[in-house]
Amino acid sequence: GERVFLIGGNGTGKTTLFKILLDKVEKDSGIIHWGTNVIPGYYDQEQSDLNISNTVIDEVWNANPQMTQTEIRNALAAFLFQGDDVFKTISTLSGGERGRVSLVKLMLSKANLLILDEPTNHLDIPSREALEAALSDYEGTIIIISHDRYFINRIATRIFELSPDGITEY
């Protein structure tokens, strides 16, 4: 699938556009129509989908009860959660670790269109590399907001810039 990046200055409306596309914010006008079999999945900067009282493994397992413990642990290991790390509670995790948990959940979801808002924020270099590997293996389409030039250059198949004048493709 394609890896489309949306870039632009702070405050140009990139996150708002994503939220409009996902019907999380009311649009002023127009119609949003996804393809017949499109299932979007969203990663937001705040990781608002996490239950802070869960452990890492329970957070992912609750979202994927059909998976075995081994499958869950393998998915978590791909995002650098190994050994006793999987038993940490979400409330004790750093911002980067919470981001990795959200990304694991999203990658295991049924979504075939990933919409990622600043997924490399708060991630250290090994975590960024794990994310890059996971996205490279992902077969669906990905739309990403990012200011991370290295990440964009490594992953992007298309780049659009949002500005007050509109959208420009590069």
Regions inferred by a protein language model and the residue ranges of each:
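ABC ATP-binding cassette signature C-motif
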Residues: 1-170
